[in-house]
């Protein structure tokens, strides 16, 4: 989980039944209060049924599972969710192999630490869906993703899309935003579609508008002189 992977560590993983299936992701949640071995055995049973690799263990008060062989970490997390104690369950993004799993682990652990900032978050939730909360909590990787995936593509188109997001956040709807921008409401709708095409986030959805707003704020902070 710290990125300290060498041949001996991979050998020990193999001894625990890790077969080297890829891609790999990490799932994090609260450890159950009862027998941990019962929880990890339940994970192993599901993994065997689904033809996945899994290694699980306790880190502090968290139960961390490394899952190999799935392109759908959220699907695996949904199957594992009942094993965890109440609280957030975070599925990290997929990586190519076990020696890169620390990237997924860092994202999942960061998401776990910041999930309380989104009271309505689903359970489980992807670490990528917690980018704003992770960024606000000081996660540099999340900040960089918001800048590279949202802020920069929008800035590169000029100022119209940025000012449209600002107006939607400030005035709370298409009609009031169009009046503030002195444009027709259909122009705002067209810009909203362009925003979605460029960023994969729709300003029509309140949660996604929040993500866009945080991305703009973080990007602007990075441009301070």
Regions found by a protein language model. Name each.
Residues 1-225:
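Cytosolic nucleotide-utilizing catalytic cores of signal-transduction proteins
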């Amino acid at each position: 989980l710290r990125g300290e992977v060498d041949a001996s560590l991979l050998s020990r993983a193999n001894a625990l039944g890790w077969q080297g299936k890829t891609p790999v992701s990490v799932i994090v949640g609260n450890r159950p209060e009862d027998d941990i071995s019962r929880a990890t055995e339940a994970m192993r049973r599901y993994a065997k049924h689904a033809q996945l690799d899994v290694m699980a263990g306790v880190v502090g008060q968290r139960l961390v599972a490394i899952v190999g062989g799935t392109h759908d970490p959220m699907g695996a997390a949904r199957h594992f969710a009942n094993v965890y104690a109440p609280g957030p369950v975070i599925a990290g993004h997929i990586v190519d192999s076990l020696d890169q799993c620390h990237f997924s682990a860092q994202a999942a652990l960061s998401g776990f630490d910041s999930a309380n900032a989104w009271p309505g978050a689903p359970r489980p939730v992807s670490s990528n869906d917690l980018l704003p909360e992770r960024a606000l909590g000081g996660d540099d990787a999340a900040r960089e993703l918001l800048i590279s995936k949202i802020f920069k593509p929008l800035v590169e188109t000029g100022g119209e899309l940025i000012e449209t997001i600002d107006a939607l956040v400030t005035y709370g709807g298409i009609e009031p935003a169009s009046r503030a921008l002195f444009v027709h409401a259909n122009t705002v709708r067209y810009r909203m579609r362009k925003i979605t095409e460029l960023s994969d986030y729709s300003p029509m959805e309140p949660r996604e508008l929040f993500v866009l707003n945080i991305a703009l704020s973080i990007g602007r902070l990075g441009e301070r002189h």
